[in-house]
């Protein structure tokens, strides 16, 4: 027994090394298909398997694993080094950078805290209403800033609210004991004592909050905590910039079908996804209410006053906050009106396909660095007249921008490019074509279930990067619009509710100490099942009208390859003179 424990501890200590070298050896038989007609596909499958193993078991940092294609693709003859490098930073990455930098500007001026407290002090202190308020605020914020940042903001506020709810509940119990102890002839003194209890509230909290919460209070705290991470995951799916997996879809569409007018843009995605996200949030609230809040302590005016007090303590609207609101609103207008579909957009003023949503995002980023944080003044001392920094500064970006996620996105795009270039996606699609014995809707449901299952054990960005090209090829082989499978796979990649390790929001909430893995798994399973059904209904009843999915589009039947510089020169009869190969 001791020997077994020693081996187990040794495996845990050297787990990282075992996974790194074990994956290389276990999948090495794939490299034996050297002279085979599918040799290139086998080599690419080896790269996918190794990267997938490293990502799932986190043998290396996720961003470092993303650089593997830069090494293996050129060595295996799948893609040239410069082609792989170009795949790491497509247009979608600049869209991601722009969206996150705007979010950093919002966080820097603390505008997000003002919005959160305003909504919470409005909904009141009833636990069910508090949950609805937190879910609404979290879902809305996660549409525009990262799910992780949203959760990190909301959890401390929620912990404060839970403390107020619990202390208020205990104070009311103490009032009830006082009323039971005194006889009816002393009603007035009891009433005076009740009025004085709020002044003793701090003393009660010091004595009582040191002890463990009652089961009823623990149950309430669990439900409120879960509502934050679940609504952050759901809300991010509502906009095309809300979560990384949505951006992966945009990048994969550009990679797999270059130059195609797929109809996927900021406005069309919002129209497609927002109704489903709204329904998912309502369903999630119902599930968590039934599981955790049916017998929760009632709220009172004290907690409402506490939220009102915190909101009143905020300073007046600063110039920075108003300027960030302006930039944020301008960005939304530029995104929505570039290709509104119903009327000509401002993008038509320029050459076709020359302007994208990334153009708008980077314009706003430069504007954030240009506009001052404080309104210039000609009065006051020389120190007061000193020029202020911009709404966003590079030190903040360097310190808080998630560069690793950018590299992870790029690695996904490079991996997808290799899968396409080697023909592996075509082969996998041909194998999956045997699913054509099923109805297309059944295949769609199978894709959703696979995506939901995998996204709970590794990054949703990874799942989207690997799985989207496969289902796209499957749809092409069945001669149906690839968006029929790509859209539900992308949406369902956000439904990571089962485990703390599934997403950073889950991990942040779990680290609060209120939850056990079993709590998250049971409630997450109920939420997942409902969200899968709602996602399926959204595809069947709504998505077809938004994206016209009923016909097999020409851009999917004959995807044009990306135009190389040399190809462009030949087409335009241009000869480069006096140039040398770099």
UniProtKB/Swiss-Prot annotation:
State which residue ranges cross the membrane: 17-37, 59-79, 87-107, 130-150, 224-244, 271-291, 317-337, 353-373, 401-421, 455-475, 482-502, 527-547
Q: Which InterPro entries match?
A: Na/sul_symport_CS (IPR031312), SLC13A/DASS (IPR001898)
Ordered alphabetically, the record's keywords are: Ion transport, Membrane, Sodium, Sodium transport, Symport, Transmembrane, Transmembrane helix, Transport
Subcellular localization, per the record?
Membrane
How this chain sits in the membrane, per its record, is: Multi-pass membrane protein
Recorded GO cellular component terms are: plasma membrane
Which tissues is this protein detected in according to the database? Nad-1 and nad-2 are coexpressed in the intestinal tract from early larvae to adults, expression is from the pharynx through to the anus. Expression level is significantly greater in the anterior half of the intestine than in the posterior half.
Q: Name one Pfam family in it.
A: Na_sulph_symp
GO BP: citrate transport; succinate transport; transmembrane transport
Q: What does this protein do?
A: Low affinity sodium-dicarboxylate cotransporter that accepts a range of tricarboxylic acid-cycle intermediates with 4-5 carbon atoms. There is no interaction with monocarboxylates.
Q: Identify its protein family.
A: Belongs to the SLC13A/DASS transporter (TC 2.A.47) family. NADC subfamily.
In terms of PANTHER family, this protein maps to: SOLUTE CARRIER FAMILY 13 MEMBER, SOLUTE CARRIER FAMILY 13 MEMBER 2
The protein, known as: Sodium-dependent low-affinity dicarboxylate transporter 1
Question: Native species of this protein?
Answer: Caenorhabditis elegans
């Amino acid at each position: 027994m001791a020997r077994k424990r020693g081996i187990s501890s040794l495996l845990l200590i050297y787990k990282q090394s075992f996974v790194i070298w074990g994956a290389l050896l276990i999948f090495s038989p794939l490299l034996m298909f050297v002279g085979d007609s599918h040799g290139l596909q086998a080599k690419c499958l080896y790269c996918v398997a190794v990267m997938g193993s490293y990502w799932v078991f986190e043998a290396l940092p996720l961003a470092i694993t993303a650089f593997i294609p830069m090494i293996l693709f050129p060595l295996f003859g799948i893609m040239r080094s410069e082609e792989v490098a170009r795949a790491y930073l497509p247009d979608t990455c600049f869209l991601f950078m722009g969206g996150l930098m705007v979010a950093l500007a919002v966080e820097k001026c603390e505008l997000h805290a003002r919005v959160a407290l305003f909504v919470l002090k409005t909904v009141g202190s009833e636990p069910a209403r508090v949950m609805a308020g937190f879910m609404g605020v979290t879902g809305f914020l996660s549409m525009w800033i990262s799910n992780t940042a949203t959760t990190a903001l909301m959890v401390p506020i929620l912990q404060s609210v839970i403390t107020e709810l619990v202390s208020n509940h205990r104070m009311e119990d103490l009032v009830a004991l006082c009323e039971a102890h005194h006889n009816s002839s002393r009603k007035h003194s009891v009433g005076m004592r009740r009025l004085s209890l709020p002044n003793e509230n701090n003393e009660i909290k010091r004595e009582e909050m040191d002890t463990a919460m009652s089961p009823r209070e623990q149950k309430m705290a669990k439900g409120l905590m879960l509502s934050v991470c679940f609504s952050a995951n759901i809300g991010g799916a509502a906009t095309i910039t809300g979560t990384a997996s949505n951006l992966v879809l945009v990048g994969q569409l550009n990679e797999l079908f270059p130059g195609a007018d797929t109809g996927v843009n900021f406005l069309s995605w919002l129209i497609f996804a927002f109704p489903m996200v709204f329904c998912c949030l309502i369903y999630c609230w119902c599930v968590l209410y039934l599981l955790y809040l049916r017998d929760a302590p009632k709220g009172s005016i004290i907690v409402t006053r506490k939220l009102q007090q915190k909101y009143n303590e905020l300073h007046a609207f600063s110039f920075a906050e108003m300027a960030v609101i302006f930039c944020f609103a301008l960005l939304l207008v530029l995104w929505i009106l570039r290709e509104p579909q119903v009327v000509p957009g401002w993008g038509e003023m320029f050459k076709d396909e020359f302007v994208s949503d990334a153009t708008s995002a980077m314009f706003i980023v430069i504007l954030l660095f240009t506009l001052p944080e404080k309104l210039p003044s000609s009065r006051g001392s020389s120190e007061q007249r000193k020029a202020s920094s911009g709404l966003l500064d590079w030190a903040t970006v360097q310190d808080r921008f998630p560069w690793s996620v950018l590299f992870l996105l790029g690695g996904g795009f490079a991996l997808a490019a290799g899968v396409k270039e080697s023909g592996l996606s075509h082969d996998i699609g041909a194998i999956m074509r045997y699913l054509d014995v099923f109805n297309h809707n059944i295949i769609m449901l199978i894709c959703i279930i696979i995506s939901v299952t995998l996204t709970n054990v590794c990054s949703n960005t990874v799942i989207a990067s690997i799985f989207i090209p496969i289902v796209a090829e499957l749809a092409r082989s069945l001669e149906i619009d690839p968006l029929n499978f790509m859209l539900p796979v992308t949406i369902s990649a956000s439904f990571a509710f089962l485990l703390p390790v599934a997403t950073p929001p889950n991990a942040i909430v779990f680290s609060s100490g209120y939850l056990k893995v079993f709590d998250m798994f049971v409630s997450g399973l109920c939420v997942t099942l409902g969200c899968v059904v709602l996602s399926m209904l959204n595809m069947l009843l709504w998505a077809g009208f938004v994206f016209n999915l009923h016909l097999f589009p020409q851009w999917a039947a004959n995807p044009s390859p990306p135009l190389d510089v040399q190809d462009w020169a030949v087409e335009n009869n241009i000869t480069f003179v006096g140039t040398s190969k770099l």
